[in-house]
Structures are given as C-alpha cells and as structure tokens.
C-alpha cells in the first residue's frame, strides 16, 4: 500500500509540475480564450476556436499554429503522457461544402488539424496522441455558443505502473 501511495504522490507532483510548465509556455494566451486547469489527475488545456480557426473552418490560422507549437514543444519530452485532443462545436448547422458534413465531422477535423501540427512541430510519440470529435454534445455552457466552440487537450499520465502495483 505504501508503494502505491508513493507512486500516486509521484504522479500527482509530476502533473502539477507539468501544469506549471504548460502555463509558462503559453503565457500571453491565457485570458484570451485559453485556460489551463488540473482536475481529476489530468491537465485540461482549453482553447476557444477564436484562437485557432476561422468560423466554420478546420484550417488553423497563424496565431493558432503558434499556440499549438508552443504547447507541443512544452510536452514533447513527456514519455509517460497520453494526449487526447477533443474538438467541440456549438449547435449551429454547418454550411454545406468544404468536405464537412456536420458538427461532428467538423469537430473531428479540427482535432485532427491540431494533432497534425503537434506531430509536425515536435517529437511527440504518435502512439500517445488521439484526435476525437465530440460535436455539439458536450457543451461548457448551453447558453454561450462561443464557449462551446473549442479544442480541449487533455493530458493524462500513463497509469500502467499503478495498475501493475495494484495487481501484484
């Protein structure tokens, strides 16, 4: 039990330290549609779409690319970190054209655009990175469409060592 508690404490400290490094790397973006929070043993980097994409598009603009590259560089050496990039949309219908069928499709394509930039600009292990789309189904605030249009990057520690300790 003591070994398990020590491993848990070590993971928690590592995540706090990582949150501080991520926040430091993204200084200048916080308060402008970006938040970095630690909850439930994970780090959540939430970016409003205005920081990344033109309306209805999944092409990341120059300022968004700068933000994503800074984040990727800040976490590229974290070998025991899983990275989930989630795209979220509002409930407005997507305009036909541009290869986007609906909000779910748009959210996946936006998440994939972010993952591609992270991969191109860093040494992150692609086996640890996942792109996912949540469409309009997980709103932050149903009354605030702008807040719901976002990318969330969820950084989770690899818990295999903890599982091994529990089994043994």
Which residue ranges define each predicted feature?
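Extracellular/lumenal/periplasmic "stalk" regions immediately C-terminal to a signal peptide or transmembrane helix
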Residues: 1-37
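Periplasmic OmpA-like peptidoglycan-binding domain that tethers envelope proteins to the cell wall
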Residues: 12, 52-70, 78, 88-167
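Short amphipathic alpha-helices and their capping/turn segments at secondary-structure boundaries
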Residues: 30-36, 69-77
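Short Gly/Ser/Thr- and Asp/Glu-enriched loop/turn motifs at secondary-structure junctions
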Residues: 38-42
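Short, aliphatic-rich beta-strand segments
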Residues: 43-48
């Amino acid at each position: 039990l003591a070994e398990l508690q020590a491993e848990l404490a070590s993971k928690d400290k590592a995540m706090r330290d990582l949150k501080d490094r991520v926040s430091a790397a993204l200084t200048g973006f916080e308060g402008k549609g970006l938040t970095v929070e630690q909850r439930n043993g994970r780090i959540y980097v939430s970016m409003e779409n205005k920081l990344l994409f033109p309306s209805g598009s999944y092409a990341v603009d120059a300022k968004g690319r700068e933000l994503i590259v800074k984040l990727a560089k800040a976490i590229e050496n974290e070998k025991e970190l899983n990275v989930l990039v989630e795209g979220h949309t509002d409930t407005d219908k997507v305009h036909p054209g541009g290869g986007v069928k609906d909000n779910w499709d748009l959210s996946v394509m936006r998440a994939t655009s972010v993952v591609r930039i992270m991969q191109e600009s860093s040494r992150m292990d692609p086996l640890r990175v996942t792109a996912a789309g949540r469409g309009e189904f997980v709103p932050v605030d149903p009354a605030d469409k702008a807040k719901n249009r976002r990318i969330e990057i969820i950084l989770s520690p690899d818990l295999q060592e903890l599982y091994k300790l529990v089994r043994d």
